[in-house]
Amino acid sequence: MRFLCLHGYAFSVEVLQQQMEPITAHLPSDWEYEFLEAGMEPTELMLPNLKQVPKPNYSWYNFPYPEDVEEAYERLAAYVESEGPFDGIWGFSQGGSMAALLLLMHQAEHPDTPYPFKMAIFTSAFLPHSFDNGVISWDLTEKNTLEPTYLPGRIDVSHGKKLDWKKDLHTSIEYDMINAVKDELDFPVDLLLRWRPSDIPEKIPVPSVHVRGLKDHYSFVDESVYELFDPEMARKMTHRGGHNFPRYNEELVHFAELIIETVVSLH
């Protein structure tokens, strides 16, 4: 098995390799793991404690400006095309979001061709952004509050209804982020919406493993990515930790069992 591994926000290949060592030690020794480093510098606007994070560190993108997300996606897709084939993709946090985006884009653009991966593994992952759902243009009112205007894309996720974009799953994460740093941004700010499981015409038919921590401090790390996938082919577990990989031996063993069961199901 050959896996393409994608790190999270303000991470690096080296840090992801270190975090994965406890779980890969429980997997077959002849499996291969290839790591791709993201291409953008993270910002303190997204991660206030960035100065405390070991360097070098990278992000796939910061705020979901359409051009930045597209650049990250195209870079990843080009790498898969040039360096593949890979048997699986393994994404942590924002890297998991990028892995899900890659599969969703394949489903949308090449529905009648084989997926680029036989399986996918997601650790502490969250929903990716969509190029089809339009953007929210956030602006500041005279009262210094954020006012959203929805500009639909190929798909109108509002279905003609008035939605509370400050709370909607498509946009609530971004609202919280830009509201926290609104005095440091230039408005208006146009940001992509996230995919929701209800947005896709059918579940992704790729065998998958989903792992998250019960103490994850990011509320948006939930079951949503799991719900993008065919439940008949998806396996999931939780562990006692937070926004990281499982650390207790019994949890590592269970994680490894889920991965191996998924690999066996491919044959």
Curated annotation (Swiss-Prot):
User: Pathway it acts in?
Assistant: Mycotoxin biosynthesis
| UniProt keyword annotations, A-Z | Hydrolase
Q: What is its EC number?
A: 3.1.-.-
Under which main EC class is this enzyme filed? Answer: hydrolase
Q: Name one GO biological process term.
A: secondary metabolic process
- GO cellular component terms listed in the entry, alphabetical order: cytoplasm; nucleus
Annotated transmembrane regions: none
Which applications in biotech or industry are described for the protein in this UniProt record?
Answer: Fusaric acid is phytotoxic to plants such as cotton and banana. It has been shown to induce programmed cell death in plants. In addition to a mild toxicity to animals, fusaric acid exhibits acanthamoebicidal, antioomycete, and antimycobacterial activities.
Q: What does this protein do?
A: Hydrolase; part of the gene cluster that mediates the biosynthesis of fusaric acid, a mycotoxin with low to moderate toxicity to animals and humans, but with high phytotoxic properties. L-aspartate is suggested as fusaric acid amino acid precursor that is activated and further processed to O-acetyl-L-homoserine by cluster enzymes aspartate kinase FUB3 and homoserine O-acetyltransferase FUB5, as well as enzymes of the primary metabolism.
Which Gene Ontology MF annotations are present?
Answer: hydrolase activity
Q: Identify the catalytic residues.
A: S93, D183, H243
Entry keyword annotation includes Repeat: no
Source organism of this protein record: Fusarium oxysporum f. sp. lycopersici (strain 4287 / CBS 123668 / FGSC 9935 / NRRL 34936) (Fusarium vascular wilt of tomato)
SUPFAM superfamilies under this entry? Answer: alpha/beta-Hydrolases (SSF53474)
Q: What is this protein called?
A: Hydrolase FUB4
Q: Which family does it belong to?
A: Belongs to the AB hydrolase 3 family.
Source taxon at top rank: Eukaryota
Which Pfam families does the UniProt entry name for this protein?
Answer: FSH1
For this protein's source organism, the top of the classification is: Eukaryota, Fungi, Dikarya, Ascomycota, Pezizomycotina
